[in-house]
A protein has these predicted regions:
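N-terminal pre-domain/capping segments
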Residues: 1-87, 156, 217, 236, ...
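Tryptophan-centric aromatic hotspots in well-structured domains and transmembrane helices
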Residues: 10-12, 32, 63, 127-128, ...
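Acidic-and-aromatic substrate-binding clefts and catalytic sites of carbohydrate-active enzymes
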Residues: 13-18, 34-47, 64-72, 95-99, ...
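Generic structural signal for well-ordered alpha-helices
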Residues: 24, 45-49, 73-77, 108-115, ...
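Conserved beta-strand positions in the central sheet of alpha/beta enzyme cores
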Residues: 36, 61, 89, 126, ...
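Active-site acidic/histidine proton-transfer and metal-coordination neighborhood
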Residues: 66-157, 177, 260
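Acidic/histidine-rich catalytic cores of soluble enzymes
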Residues: 120-228
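C-terminal/domain-terminus segments
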Residues: 243-273
Length: 275
């Protein structure tokens, strides 16, 4: 059974800031079934809920900064519960929180606490990976350590298939590894030249001093179906794993493209696969 397709609104964040509701309407017009938020831009949760219901698009989830959720989870998460989101997501870890640092153990415990707060509000916490979670701890990927430490009812996966591939792991196989624990999967495509990938996090709008120096044009995010990812295999893995949603995300457009056209091309490609 084909799964519904949502879009991570970070992909069109500048458009969201300029015209919040108009941009969500455009996502509906492009054929997206749902949206995943990346900020509410000062809009009222009740109004967002009503608008989504009116146009027939589902607010499935939201990326919420880790520290915001950790410091005041009930207040921060209640907005998304009011909107009607089923999921909230840890989207990214700053350098001091990551595996390989002294802060990682505290981060794992913090994620557990957020998961408990989310559960109390009727929300399910997910974790959205990058590539830095694929360092090993005692022979095991740090991402697997996170999932084996925090119980499944408090934390499920939001596997970003681009970053899994960048880390050198087969994304379809990794999605299936977490069958029954992968309700939402990020579809993201890319192309690269050479082995040195440059400052990848600049491309997602984050300044990260831990990155390598940039090699021009070595890496580019692409619309889904326009890069190196085996999208049909990933989609089949999502179905096999029992996923509920796939989410298109493109952190930055390819050269000479625009964010709106990027998400349009991604949706059109998925339609050619009858998704």
């Amino acid at each position: 059974m084909k799964l519904p397709v949502a879009v991570q609104l970070y992909s069109v964040r500048d458009e969201m800031e300029k015209d919040f509701y108009g941009t969500i309407q455009k996502m509906k017009d492009l054929g997206y079934d749902g949206v995943e938020f990346a900020g509410l831009f000062g809009e009222e949760p009740s109004k967002i809920k009503d608008f989504c219901a009116e146009i027939g698009i589902i607010p499935i989830s939201a990326h919420v900064p880790y520290y915001d959720m950790l410091e005041n989870p009930e207040k921060v998460l209640s907005d998304y519960a009011e909107i009607g989101c089923k999921y909230v997501v840890v989207p990214y870890l700053t350098e001091e929180c990551r595996p390989g640092t002294d802060g990682f153990a505290a981060t794992v415990e913090g994620i557990r606490k957020i998961g408990e707060a989310a559960k109390a509000l009727g929300l399910q916490l997910l974790y959205h990976n990058h590539d830095f979670e694929f360092v090993t701890i005692d022979g095991e990927y740090a991402l697997d350590v996170l999932y084996s430490t925090v119980p499944s009812d408090l934390l499920k996966t939001e596997i970003d298939t681009c970053w899994v591939n960048v880390a050198g792991v087969n994304p379809a196989e990794y999605v299936e590894k977490y069958s029954g624990r992968s309700p939402v999967v990020h579809l993201k495509d890319f192309k690269k030249s050479g082995d040195k990938l440059g400052k990848l996090y600049d491309l997602i709008g984050i300044d990260d001093d831990a990155q390598e120096e940039e090699e021009e044009d070595s890496f580019s995010f692409m619309p889904v179906g326009y890069g190196v990812q085996d999208i049909p295999a990933i989609l089949a893995a999502c179905e096999n794993a029992g996923a509920e949603w796939v989410v298109v995300e493109q952190d930055s457009p390819a050269k000479n493209d625009t964010p709106l056209n990027s998400v349009k091309l991604s949706r059109e490609y998925l339609k050619t696969l009858n998704w």
